[in-house]
């Protein structure tokens, strides 16, 4: 049987290789299997792995591993560095089949040089745990990097220094050593007004998706407001960042993973704004404001994990997380409405987090598995505000929870059964405590190699104590899914979920009561056809969202000659959204598509988004109906690297409309962007970026950047950049808000020159 499979795999590879090759696009093929080494032993993942070869035709500016994924079919990299494959975030990045950065795969993507690796292997249905591989189905996605031999068991480093005007500099260092017993990756950067850096405190604080913090640190609107041009046009920004991860092999079956992250940012903002409140009739008012904000953010996170894996008999995993985050803001605000006044405010926020998880799995007679796990966390959130208008405001928030599970599982031929009991105690604030006790049973059946059926049922009781009141009720959850897998690309996935709990409990947990999910994709060599449809219908009693929620999305993807053509549609309907000032009914629709023109080596893409909302808002003591409509259209064209030239052009149109009472306000903005790169010689690269911001009514702005990169050798590079060459010192943008028009004016640092030198060894 295995011989037949290998023959099928080889024939499949021949079909893939026989497709028309295009030098401008990264080639890929399906490989028979990949070896994954979780500490001890070898796990083989077959029939679900794609290999991408890293060619010399990639963008010459490619430096780090995350730059590679911008050129690979199906991958997308966000501004935060998260990597998605066909809309699903990857679970992990392995190096030669071994887990290295188990806490955050971005440590590998951001701090390792792309030249260290020869190929990228995509793993579908990835399982990091040998026990889960036998008993639980998973649709997780992971990436394995094949490292070149000359970079193993040696120190690899990237060192860079950037000097900018006026008086700006930044130093960066990335050091790694990937040995047999010790694997370490570290990155440090120090920035003094050279580049603008913003990071999300919430992005680095979560331990896992199932553990949520009570509240994120709230940034001032000046810091959270986005601008339609490059962030480094703003000045007065200093930061330092240290990220490190270590993986230590202890003996033959134990591993210790350690990660340390430290980030601090000190930045200043200044802007002036004018807001016109207009609802028609007799109500119309204008407000002018000049604001200066000083902000300091810091985050320190320490994680340690211990894993022991004794082949197929016993596995244990323990983790400790310590986090400390702080935010301090000083505000100077001058307001002119009926009269003028100056306000000085000081606010500080902090959050301390402790998290622990541990569990053991024991296999008996190669059929039975006993499992025990426990999770516990404590979060303390503090916020204090001293303001001339607010006077003072202090908030202390505490969240504690502990979850324990005792379960067992066994296998009878192609059927796997698992049952157990879970206990949950959660405290939020001083007046709310939740207790849940429920038993669960799961069944998984593999009907041949193609069909897989799973069911899950949970029944128990819940007890909520809130401000002296007590709620008790019977709770249950039913879940079922059917998976038909013909090949790596050909599958049908159907899922249904139904649950019932106490409405008051959902104040803490946002979950749909009813959920349906279906996915279908089919492959006809040499053409891949993918159609994904997902529908979610549910009702939730969360303190933010209440009422009926509906989500639908459908995506069509066609892969021909290693080129992806796709079109997608998704909609989102949410009614009766609870806000602090009333209810909101909204609808959102998104459509996108792209096609690759072989004759011109150009990818054309289109994107359309529509959002509509209705709500009541109290304005000057009077409830006013408000309707907001926002539309965005984006058309882009991007060439692949063909010989010496690369171009990227995008045209975006944004339209905003608000109706408040009898008054109507609208604004339209066009944003054009052109990126050109030219490889002047083998080790030289020049680039130009031009942006044109054109409001329908208002001033036209143009921004131009230029860079010249010279690489005398494989290890040394010099880059000269000129930012904001049009010397724009002040930028004014108009926004449509629910009850009027807001004009915001921001001061820029003007023309800026930078020179960067970097070396890799």
Tell me the role of every PLM-derived stretch.
Residues 18-33, 39-328, 347-352, 357-374, ...:
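Membrane-proximal, glycine/serine-rich, low-complexity loop/turn segments characteristic
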Residues 133-135, 197-203, 268-286, 327-339, ...:
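Outer-membrane beta-barrel translocator domains and adjoining extracellular loop/strand segments
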Residues 138-161, 253, 263-282, 302-307, ...:
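Surface-exposed extracellular loop regions of Gram-negative outer-membrane beta-barrel proteins
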Residues 139, 162, 166-171, 236-244, ...:
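Residues that define the transmembrane beta-barrel architecture of outer-membrane proteins
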Residues 295-299, 303-307, 345-363, 378-454, ...:
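Outer-membrane beta-barrel transmembrane domain signature of Gram-negative proteins
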Residues 353, 369-379, 398-558, 681-690, ...:
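Structural signature of Gram-negative outer-membrane beta-barrels, strongest in the C-terminal barrel
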Residues 440, 522-528, 545-642, 754, ...:
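Outer membrane beta-barrel strand-and-loop segments of large Gram-negative receptors
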Residues 630-761:
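Conserved C-terminal beta-signal and adjacent last beta-strands/turns
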């Amino acid at each position: 049987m295995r011989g037949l499979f290998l023959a099928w795999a080889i024939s499949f590879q021949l079909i893939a290789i026989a497709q028309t090759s295009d030098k401008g696009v990264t080639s890929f093929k399906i490989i028979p299997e990949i070896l994954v080494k979780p500490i001890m032993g070898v796990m083989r993942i077959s029939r679900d792995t794609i290999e991408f070869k890293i060619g010399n035709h990639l963008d010459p500016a490619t430096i780090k591993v995350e730059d590679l994924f911008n050129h690979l079919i199906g991958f997308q990299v966000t501004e935060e560095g998260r990597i998605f494959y066909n809309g699903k975030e990857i679970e992990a990045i392995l190096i030669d089949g071994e887990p290295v950065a188990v806490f955050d795969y971005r440590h590998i993507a951001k701090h390792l040089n792309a030249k260290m690796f020869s190929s990228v292997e995509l793993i579908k249905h990835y399982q990091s745990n040998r026990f889960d591989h036998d008993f639980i189905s998973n649709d997780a996605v992971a990436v394995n990097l094949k490292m070149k031999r000359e970079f193993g068991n040696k120190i690899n480093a990237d060192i860079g220094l950037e000097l900018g005007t006026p008086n700006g500099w930044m130093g960066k260092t990335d050091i790694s050593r990937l040995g047999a017993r010790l694997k370490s990756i570290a990155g440090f950067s120090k920035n003094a007004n050279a580049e603008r850096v913003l990071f999300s405190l919430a992005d680095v604080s979560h331990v896992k998706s199932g553990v949520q913090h009570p509240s994120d640190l709230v940034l001032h609107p000046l810091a959270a407001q986005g601008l339609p041009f490059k962030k480094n046009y703003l000045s007065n920004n200093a930061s330092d960042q240290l990220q490190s991860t270590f993986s230590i092999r202890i003996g033959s079956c134990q591993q210790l993973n350690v990660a340390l992250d430290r980030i601090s940012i000190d930045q200043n903002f200044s802007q002036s704004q004018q807001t016109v409140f207009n609802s028609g009739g007799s109500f119309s008012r204008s407000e002018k404001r000049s604001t200066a904000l000083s902000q300091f953010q810091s985050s320190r996170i320490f994680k340690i994990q211990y894993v022991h894996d004794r082949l197929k008999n016993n596995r244990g995993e323990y983790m400790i997380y310590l986090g400390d985050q702080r935010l301090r803001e000083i505000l100077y605000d001058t307001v002119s409405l009926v009269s003028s006044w100056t306000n000085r405010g000081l606010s500080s926020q902090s959050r301390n987090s402790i998290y622990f998880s541990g569990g053991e799995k024991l296999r008996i007679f190669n059929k039975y598995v006993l499992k025990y796990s426990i999770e516990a966390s404590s979060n303390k959130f503090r916020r204090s505000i001293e303001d001339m208008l607010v006077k003072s405001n202090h908030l202390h928030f505490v969240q504690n929870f502990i979850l324990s599970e005792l379960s067992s599982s066994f296998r009878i031929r192609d059927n796997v059964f698992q049952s157990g009991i879970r206990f949950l105690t959660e405290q939020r604030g001083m007046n709310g405590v939740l207790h849940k006790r429920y038993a669960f049973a799961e069944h998984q059946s593999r009907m041949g190699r193609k069909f897989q059926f799973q069911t899950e049922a949970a029944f128990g009781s819940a007890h909520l104590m809130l401000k002296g009141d007590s709620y008790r009720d019977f709770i249950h959850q039913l879940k079922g899914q059917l998976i038909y897998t013909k090949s790596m690309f050909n599958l049908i996935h159907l899922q249904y979920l139904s649950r019932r709990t106490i409405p008051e409990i959902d104040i803490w947990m946002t979950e749909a009561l009813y959920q349906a999910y279906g996915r279908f994709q089919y492959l006809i060599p040499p053409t891949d056809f993918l159609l994904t449809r997902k529908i979610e219908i549910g009702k939730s009693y969360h303190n933010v969202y209440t009422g009926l929620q509906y989500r639908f999305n459908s995506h069509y993807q066609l892969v021909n000659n290693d080129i992806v053509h796709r079109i997608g549609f998704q909609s989102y309907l949410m009614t009766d959204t609870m806000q602090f000032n009333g209810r909101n009914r909204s609808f959102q629709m998104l459509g996108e598509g792209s096609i690759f023109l072989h004759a011109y080596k150009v990818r054309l893409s289109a994107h359309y988004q529509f959002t509509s909302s209705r709500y009541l808002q109290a304005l000057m003591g009077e409830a006013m109906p408000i309707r907001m409509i926002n539309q965005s259209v984006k058309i882009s064209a991007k060439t692949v690297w063909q010989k010496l030239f690369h171009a990227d052009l995008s045209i975006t149109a944004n339209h905003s409309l608000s109706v408040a009472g009898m008054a109507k306000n609208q604004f339209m903005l066009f944003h054009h962007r052109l990126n050109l790169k030219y490889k002047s010689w083998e080790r030289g690269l020049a680039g130009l970026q031009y942006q044109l911001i054109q409001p329908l009514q208002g001033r036209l702005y143009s921004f131009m950047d230029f860079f010249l990169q010279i690489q005398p050798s494989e290890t040394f590079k010099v880059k000269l950049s000129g930012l904001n060459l049009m010397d724009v010192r002040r930028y004014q943008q108009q926004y449509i808000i629910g009850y009027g028009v807001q004009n915001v004016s921001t001061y820029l640092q003007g023309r800026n020159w930078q020179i960067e030198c970097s070396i890799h060894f």
